Amino acid sequence: MYIPSHFLETDLQKISQFIKTHPLGLMVANVDGELVGNHLPFMAPNGNIAVGSKLISHTAKANPIWKIGEKKQKVLLVFSGYETYISPSSYPTKSETHKVVPTYNYLSVHINGTLSAIQDEEDKHQIVKILTEKMESSRKDPWAVADAPKDYIETMLANIVGVELLVEKMEAKWKVSQNRPARDRQGVIDDLRGNVNDPNSLEMAREIEALGGLKPGHQESE
């Protein structure tokens, strides 16, 4: 992924929290010479995500993508969020120089790794249990795998395949107006906060506000 230095994010805790908040990843793989994408929710069973850690998910057995896991094939996993259009009209400097153009702000994490397929029934049950507990943790009345009839769960497990991704490379890009002067950033924050019905805009405003000062040596490149 192309990442100018001022957009590079290396804080593993921040990256891990972002993936926890946006677990639906786009997994891209080479299948018989063609690039194939699948959207799957991935989570880390324990702690922060880093090189050497593992992410787990599952897919329908009818989806042939799991078969690349039997070959221990390399895949690319993409997580993204808070995509927000930034208008030049947000910048106070527009009225002074008019040397401004539109752009998009976003957060993105790219993970390269080796995929493995998991067919053992107990292992699949554990994957489903972990994913369910993490997804349901914020609910007032969380659902648990044990709430469903045992024979029903067994049927469901028979029709899925677990997948595990070993993280071998991870890159994170936080494009949150680091390349704009402080007053332009404030203009963007004010503009985004006006979009009260758009969660992406409000979250992006928080990300920009968290920047503080500009990173040394920032450039105006995208």
What kind of feature is each model-predicted range?
Residues 1-222:
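Binding-site signature for planar aromatic cofactors or substrates
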